Amino acid sequence: MLTLKILVYTTVIFFVSLFIFGFLSSDPSRNPNRKDLE
């Protein structure tokens, strides 16, 4: 059960960090006129 929980937590953290990284890296290129948010 502990191994399953660790696997789930690792997958969740991986996808969350991937989503945050993708959002931060694509946000300025998608909205070049909103650099004041940075």
Curated annotation (Swiss-Prot):
Keyword entries, A-Z: Chloroplast, Membrane, Photosynthesis, Photosystem II, Plastid, Reaction center, Thylakoid, Transmembrane, Transmembrane helix
Transmembrane residue ranges: 6-26
Record bears the keyword ATP-binding: no
Subcellular location: Plastid, Chloroplast thylakoid membrane
Domain of life: Eukaryota
Pfam families: PsbI
One record GO biological process: photosynthesis
Annotated membrane topology: Single-pass membrane protein
Role summary: One of the components of the core complex of photosystem II (PSII), required for its stability and/or assembly. PSII is a light-driven water:plastoquinone oxidoreductase that uses light energy to abstract electrons from H(2)O, generating O(2) and a proton gradient subsequently used for ATP formation. It consists of a core antenna complex that captures photons, and an electron transfer chain that converts photonic excitation into a charge separation.
Family: Belongs to the PsbI family.
Complexes and interactors: PSII is composed of 1 copy each of membrane proteins PsbA, PsbB, PsbC, PsbD, PsbE, PsbF, PsbH, PsbI, PsbJ, PsbK, PsbL, PsbM, PsbT, PsbX, PsbY, PsbZ, Psb30/Ycf12, at least 3 peripheral proteins of the oxygen-evolving complex and a large number of cofactors. It forms dimeric complexes.
Alphabetized PANTHER family for the sequence: PHOTOSYSTEM II REACTION CENTER PROTEIN I
Protein name per its UniProtKB record: Photosystem II reaction center protein I
Source organism (scientific name): Trieres chinensis (Marine centric diatom)
